[in-house]
């Protein structure tokens, strides 16, 4: 068992840019693990939600030593099905995912004074407690919590790409299906928000 943090999260250095680094980083991680003296050279992956997404992207990289994946409760199209639904920005999901799951670690890493950190922390707490007032903030690009590009800078980048374009194409798993030959056990839930991508 080898836990790995994606770039810019937890113990890994760098900047987190959801999905965009996981293809190359997934390839490198799988092949590194396969070369270790304690490894038999056969690598498998498992995980839920974003960790499922990293598996699909590693499989799309065609890492030769990736033998199987077990993605659970994750999407396969990170434009339509994760960030947007039918062209509509998934505001409530993106606010909570960006702020609660990712924002607190971003804020902890940032070099900010207490005066600068205070309003951002209050904004994260507000989204975590009752995110509905934030969903009514217009324009959605200017939600105060994301104003300084310290917390989840990708949030604004996603809004800058409201249609499927060159930003989304390299990370669309559905388009990569013909080149994925890694066996996969795909687990979903009927009431999971990513069920379309699972099916």
List PLM regions with ranges:
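Residue-level marker for beta-strand->alpha-helix junctions and adjacent short loops that shape enzyme
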Residues: 8, 50, 76-77
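Accessory cap/linker subdomain of secreted extracellular hydrolases
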Residues: 60-62, 68-179
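Short beta-strand/loop motif that positions the catalytic acidic residue
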Residues: 180, 186-188
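Short, hydrophobic alpha-helix immediately C-terminal to the catalytic nucleophile
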Residues: 27, 56-60, 199
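Conserved alpha/beta-hydrolase "acid-adjacent" motif
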Residues: 193-199
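Short beta-strand immediately N-terminal to the catalytic nucleophile in serine-hydrolase-like folds
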Residues: 45-47, 72, 187
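Cap/lid segment of the alpha/beta-hydrolase catalytic domain
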Residues: 1-35, 81-85, 89-91
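Alpha/beta-hydrolase fold nucleophile elbow
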Residues: 36-54
């Amino acid at each position: 068992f080898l836990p790995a943090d994606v770039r810019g999260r937890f113990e890994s250095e760098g900047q987190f840019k959801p999905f965009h680094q996981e293809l190359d980083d997934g390839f490198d991680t799988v092949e590194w693990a396969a070369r270790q003296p304690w490894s038999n050279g056969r690598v498998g992956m498992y995980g839920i939600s974003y960790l499922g997404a990293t598996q699909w992207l590693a499989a799309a990289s065609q890492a030769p030593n990736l033998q199987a994946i077990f993605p659970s409760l994750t999407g396969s199209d990170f434009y339509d099905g994760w960030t947007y639904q039918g062209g509509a920005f998934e505001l409530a999901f993106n606010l909570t995912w960006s702020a609660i799951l990712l924002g607190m670690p971003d804020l902890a890493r940032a070099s900010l004074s207490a005066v600068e950190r205070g309003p951002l922390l209050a904004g994260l707490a507000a989204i975590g407690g009752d995110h509905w007032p934030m969903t009514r903030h217009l324009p959605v690009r200017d939600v105060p919590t994301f104003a300084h590009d310290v917390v989840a800078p990708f949030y604004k980048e996603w809004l800058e790409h409201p249609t499927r374009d060159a930003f989304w194409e390299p990370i669309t798993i559905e388009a990569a299906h013909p080149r994925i030959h890694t066996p996969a056990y795909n687990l979903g839930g009927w009431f999971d928000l990513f069920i379309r991508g699972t099916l």
